[in-house]
UniProtKB/Swiss-Prot annotation:
Record protein name field: UPF0507 protein SCRG_01893
Boundaries of every VPS9 domain copy: 289-436
PANTHER family: ANKYRIN REPEAT DOMAIN-CONTAINING PROTEIN 27, DOMAIN PROTEIN, PUTATIVE (AFU_ORTHOLOGUE AFUA_1G09870)-RELATED
Domain of life: Eukaryota
GO BP term, example: early endosome to late endosome transport
Family per record: Belongs to the UPF0507 family.
Species: Saccharomyces cerevisiae (strain RM11-1a) (Baker's yeast)
GO molecular function, one term: SNARE binding
Annotated signal sequence range: none
UniProt cross-references to Gene3D superfamilies, sorted A to Z: Ankyrin repeat-containing domain, VPS9 domain
Gene Ontology terms: cellular component: early endosome; late endosome; plasma membrane; transport vesicle; tubular endosome
Length: 1090
């Protein structure tokens, strides 16, 4: 076996198995011998783990263990016939080289390490790669499957010591769940211990149960009887404090109080609600309270001091607080009620961290302060909007059922309870309906009346005199909508215009700019969302006339709670887009990662889609140029990895004109734009993108190994993408694709060049017909350099349905080989050009061809006598060609390995760069860590498309060269030496004959002897018998020479013809279709990188 040295691969496990320079001297030589003719799958952990971690048990680095056969065996999955078939359970069972069991769920990309593994793990498949075999010691397959998994298996691993300079380097695998390290305070621990002791001692539980019954018996049905509750708690405390079981509890009284509260809460609460029945606060009639009615101090500020921005921030606080106060109805203890009350006030005042919604609010919300009166007024609104029932009952509970009476009088809780008490008094004053309260009630009624008119579609219930509602025009509802916003959403545009024109001083432009709902929707956003284009145009006209460019940019790019600007809501509003397009931040993304341009591109239900898309793209392009940059396609990728090409329904030429555009980019599901177009039958897009030279037609979806052909269910779609396949094929003549199974019979779609009306034709042909066609061609061309026997055998195995990834890779490989094979046959005119118009044409041609072949005379009837000079000429011709072919074959072998390694090392470079960046960011030294951010790389020295095409052509050419070389080798080193051997024997026989019978001109035949002497068989002499025996041997030797010579002559003629065909094919394949195409594509790639 030859020794070769190729670059070391980054992943130690992949390198150890596939890239051994001297396998016969390797410590893994037995493993290599075992796997020599077998197919297998390799599970490969990330390089980061193998290079930077070590095994806990053996203390050895994982990269050293990669050269240990015992370690490697668990990562090698042996393939059987069942490996190609999906079972109904969709799980594939595999056995490792050392007999362990692994189950792969292909659909979920999950691997389960089961029987035999001392650590059972659930592994995630990060990536599936097909590794072309480049070594000389594995003969079982031309390609091997590598499943990259998220962590090593069958060992415990920890980071190496040198990683201590990195901060928190250890990573938890994605499929592992870290157990949170929760700190439990001492009181919670004591409560748990207290309850455990009670459950262990039933006598104590019985005593407490009697006290519970005592409360239920003694307390009246409409009186919560605080004194009775405190009495039984004290009684229990007196009985327990001297008990040795409870002597270690530092908070025994609190524990007993909470335990009694837990068991008696329902009884206490039912008595409370009964007690306050008919006297509770009814917030229903105050639902129209607004900020403008309660925060009069804000609205009475001078024009220069008042900012509507403050009101919108308060509205958001009110919304958060109202939502939180609604939880009060779910509480069942003093602690829970007090916690909700305090947190509600904190959210209202902005004095503490709020929930996740607040994190999206402007910073000013947390910095705004307010006095006690303002807080009470706002809390009134909170109570109204939360629709809180039993408010007095909650207040009474908080005031009377604390385990520490001072907590409700002092501190933050005391302040909260006092505020709640003030709010209750506030509502009681409202019920008296006197003085200012009466005025407020009147305003509520007037507000209700106006809102009813604004929301009513009955023309008889319209607003007749807007002036009568002047004092409530500053109203804002619980969603933060102003009267303007309510008019917009209800399409009351005539009222909107009246307000904007008649009450301009009450609604200045500054307030229009700051008017937002609690979810951040501006008036313009509300207009677009409501489909009120007339209102939108009015607002835009006002803004354009009164605002500076800076104000316009700020306003138009304001975002709502979904991080959407007004541009994200534009779908078919062409005029609005044109009027505000130059002020839109086209790079601004919403919470889904979608830019305004992305949102417009995916709004498919608009009537003028193409025009809208073109206009939006042109405006965005202009915006980029205005900001001194070129349109950046990568700015518009969403959180799912979808690009503009993925979502564009039609008119993709506007994007294909971009130079720095990856038209083969995958989203996070592994779908390319072409796959999406094929899946949803977007024919115009398919037509445009298949004409782009940058397209990789057979890009594979990593998770399923589907290509675009697997998503094609329509014949017109298959034909369209098949045409591109033909153009990309070796000689642009034919393309095999889309293998399908029907009742275990495999069929394939074939697109080929046609002489009919259409330039291309796509037909469905049974694979058995293709197999028969190959057999017929092989009979006509027994010395063909095409490996037809290999293809015939592989087609015989296509009787499996529901192929797994493994089967799909084999099918894809076979279809590629058949495409190349028939391209060559058509190129050399071995078969007619219109053969694949339909299956009947193929069958007819095969019958005609068989008939012609049977009519040809056999060469064995008239064997040709070959002279030594002729044999020498043939031998010299074949030796010269054999040397040339062998030299070329060696060059192809080197070129194939170089191409494979260009791709492998490019991936290694990318992985190493990512690992370096990740480690650099974890450096403890911040200056050193920041230095890694400036690293720039460019590993795309070659186009993925051009490399794949060139490698496929080189591999095919190498197969053909090996096939032809084997035929030449047989003739040159077997047939011709055999002829020379028999020729020497023939000469020796002649020499013996002349020496023994010098007077004989030529050897006599048996017939001559018998005619001369009828009874010669009995009387012939010993000399005559010897002469006859030599004559027979000479005749047999002469016949053998003629047969061998004739066989060599025919083989030589056919080989000479095949060599000529091969040279023609080789030149066209390597020079024109491979190297030139490779160079052209890469020049284009490098130009795009400049």
């Amino acid at each position: 076996m030859s020794v070769y040295h190729l670059p070391t691969l980054l992943n130690p496990l992949v390198n150890a198995i596939f890239n051994c320079p001297e396998p016969e001297r390797s410590p893994l030589k037995k493993l290599f011998a075992n796997l020599k003719t077998r197919r297998f799958i390799l599970l490969a952990p990330p390089s980061e783990y193998l290079l930077n971690y070590h095994d806990v048990k053996s203390k050895l680095p994982l990269h050293d263990l990669c050269y240990n056969a015992e370690f490697i065996n668990s990562y090698i999955l042996l393939m059987t016939e069942n490996s190609y078939i999906n079972t109904n359970s969709r799980d594939s069972h595999y056995e490792t080289l050392d007999g362990k069991t692994v189950v792969i769920q292909w659909k979920n990309n999950v691997i389960h390490a089961l029987n035999g593994f001392h650590i059972r793990r659930r592994l995630k498949i990060l990536e599936t790669k097909i590794l072309p075999n480049f070594n000389d010691y594995f003969e079982g397959a031309a390609d091997f499957i590598i499943l990259f998994i998220d962590q090593p298996l069958n060992c415990e691993f920890v980071p190496n010591d040198y990683l201590q300079c990195f901060h928190n380097y250890e990573k938890i695998p994605k499929n592992a769940h870290a157990m949170p390290n929760l700190s439990i305070d001492s009181f919670q621990q004591e409560r748990s211990s207290f309850e455990n002791i009670l459950h262990i001692h039933p006598a104590r539980l019985t005593q407490l149960g009697q006290l519970f019954s005592s409360y239920r018996t003694l307390a009246p049905g409409d009186d919560p009887s605080r004194s009775i509750f405190e009495s039984i708690v004290q009684q229990a405390f007196d009985g327990m404090k001297s008990d040795s079981l409870f002597k270690n509890f530092s908070n025994l009284y609190d524990l007993i109080h909470d335990y009694f509260e837990l068991n008696l809460y329902d009884d206490i609460w039912s008595r409370l609600t009964t007690h306050f029945k008919g006297h509770e606060v009814d917030t229903e009639k105050y639902k129209y309270f607004s900020v403008n009615q309660l925060l009069t101090d804000f609205y009475s500020k001078d024009y220069g001091e008042f900012e509507l921005h403050d009101i919108t921030l308060i509205e958001r606080r009110l919304h958060l607080a109202s939502k939180h106060l609604q939880k009060l109805a779910l509480t069942h203890s003093y602690a829970e009620k007090s916690k909700i009350l305090v947190e509600t006030l904190q959210k209202l005042s902005g004095t503490t961290e709020m929930d996740s919604h607040q994190l999206e609010l402007p910073d000013g919300l947390n910095n705004m302060t307010m006095d006690a009166d303002t807080l009470i007024s706002l809390f009134v609104l909170v109570v109204c909007r939360s629709e809180q029932k039993h408010l007095k009952s909650h207040l009474y509970y908080l005031q009377n059922f604390s385990n520490n009476s001072s907590s409700t009088k002092f501190g933050i809780l005391g302040y909260a309870v006092s505020t709640l008490e003030a709010v209750v008094c506030y509502f009681e004053d409202f019920n008296k309906n006197t003085g200012n309260v009466a005025k407020a009630n009147t305003l509520c009624e007037k507000t209700k009346n106006l809102l009813d008119k604004l929301s009513c579609e009955n023309p008889t219930n319209e607003v007749e005199d807007l002036a009568t509602y002047k004092d409530i025009l500053t109203y804002r509802n619980e969603q933060g909508q102003s009267i303007l916003s309510i008019c917009i959403t209800n399409h009351k545009n005539y009222i909107l215009l009246d307000i904007l024109s008649e009450y301009e001083t009450d609604f200045p432009v500054e307030d229009l700019l700051e008017d937002e709902t609690i979810d951040g929707s501006t008036l313009l956003i509300e207009s677009i969302k409501a489909g009120n284009l007339e209102a939108a145009k009015v607002l835009i006209k006002i803004m354009l006339f009164n605002c500076t460019e800076e104000e316009l940019v700020s306003y138009i790019n304001k975002t709502d709670k979904y991080a959407r600007t007004v541009a994200h809501y534009l779908t078919h509003e062409m005029d609005i887009l044109k009027s505000i397009g130059n002020y839109i931040d086209w790079k601004r993304k919403n919470s889904s990662g979608q830019t305004p341009l992305f949102s417009i591109f995916r709004s498919y239900d608009q009537p003028n889609y193409e025009e809208m898309v073109k206009t939006a793209f042109d405006i965005a392009n202009t915006w980029y140029r205005k900001h001194n940059s070129l349109f950046d396609y990568l700015d518009h990728t969403d959180n799912k990895g979808n690009s503009l090409l993925h979502v564009l329904k039609t008119n993709i030429p506007i994007l294909l004109q971009l130079t720095k555009l990856d038209i083969n980019e995958e989203n996070y599901k592994g779908l390319t734009p072409l796959m999406v177009y094929v899946k949803y039958k977007r024919l115009s897009n398919i037509d445009a993108i298949t004409k782009d030279r940058r397209l990789i037609l057979e890009k594979v979806q990593n998770s399923t190994f589907f290509t675009c052909f697997d998503y094609a269910k329509d014949h017109s779609v298959l034909s369209k993408i098949g045409e591109r396949g033909v153009k990309d094929s070796l000689f642009g003549l034919i393309y095999f694709h889309s293998l399908r199974y029907h009742n275990l019979n495999a069929t394939t779609n074939i697109t080929s060049v046609s002489n009919a009306e259409k330039p291309f034709a796509t037909t469905v042909i049974n694979m058995k017909t293709i197999q028969g066609l190959l057999r017929s061609i092989l009979k006509d061309n027994p010395f063909t350099f095409l490996p037809l026997n290999t293809y015939i055998d592989e087609i015989s195995h296509l009787n499996r349905s529901d192929l797994t990834i493994i089967g799909k890779t084999d099918v894809t490989s076979l279809l590629h080989q058949l495409t190349n094979c028939f391209n060559v046959l058509l190129f050399l005119k071995k078969i007619p050009e219109n053969l694949f118009t339909d299956e009947a044409s193929i069958l007819y041609w095969m019958r005609i061809n068989t008939s012609k072949r049977n009519q040809k005379p056999s060469g064995k009837e008239n064997p040709k006598t070959m002279e030594p000079e002729e044999i020498n000429m043939i031998q010299s011709f074949l030796r010269f060609n054999f040397d040339e072919i062998s030299s070329f074959k060696a060059s192809l072998n080197i070129l194939r390995k170089v191409l494979i390694f260009i791709n492998l090392k490019s991936d290694d470079f990318e992985d190493a760069y990512k690992g370096l960046n990740e480690m650099g960011r974890k450096l403890i030294n911040s200056e050193a860590s920041s230095a890694f951010k400036g690293i720039i790389t460019n590993h795309n020295m070659f186009s993925e498309l051009s490399l794949a095409e060139l490698l496929e052509n080189v591999r095919f050419l190498e197969q053909c060269t090996i096939q032809l070389s084997s035929f030449v080798q047989i003739i040159l080193f077997e047939k011709i030496p055999n002829w020379w051997k028999h020729y020497g024997e023939f000469l020796a026989l002649h020499k013996s004959y002349r020496k023994a019978f010098p007077n004989m001109v030529k050897p006599k035949s048996a017939s001559d002897t018998s005619s001369r002497a009828p009874l010669g068989g009995f009387i012939e002499t010993k000399r005559e018998q010897s002469e006859q025996r030599l004559a027979v041997q000479i005749k047999a030797s002469s016949k053998m020479l003629k047969e061998l010579g004739s066989e060599i002559f025919v083989a030589h003629e056919r080989l000479a013809e095949e060599l000529s065909n091969y040279m023609e094919f080789r030149k066209a394949c390597l020079d024109q279709r491979s190297l030139v195409a490779f160079a052209t594509t890469n020049i284009s790639v490098l130009q795009e990188c400049v």
